[in-house]
């Protein structure tokens, strides 16, 4: 039996076939992605930025624990925040329920493919998702997904799954 990543002729329909992201995402050209990077970052600056991103993600999870009011989030830590690149590759995911991280990128890739053209992805948008055919582990897990824009370009994604 082939691995799911090797199946190329099955189309996502949400009934019999789940969403499997293609190697190259079909993103609307109307959505501008931030593609610049700096190859000359010195090791100290790199470590400062890396640790700041980790701490931002940690604080994201701690905030969810404090404000959720859910014993499942507060004590079982059944949640996971993530930071992803503009095209849904992982930067960081929290030290909580790791299986939730494994599906977050799939959900964001689906949004990029199926929402970038119509209705479009804009600054200030928030996406709420819980479809296990697309990216949620099961329907009880709900993802809140926020695109982050810088100077009119999609810079990254901030997500949490609870």
Where are these regions (language model features)?
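Glycine/proline-enriched, intrinsically flexible loops and inter-domain linkers
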Residues: 2-123, 131-150, 154-162
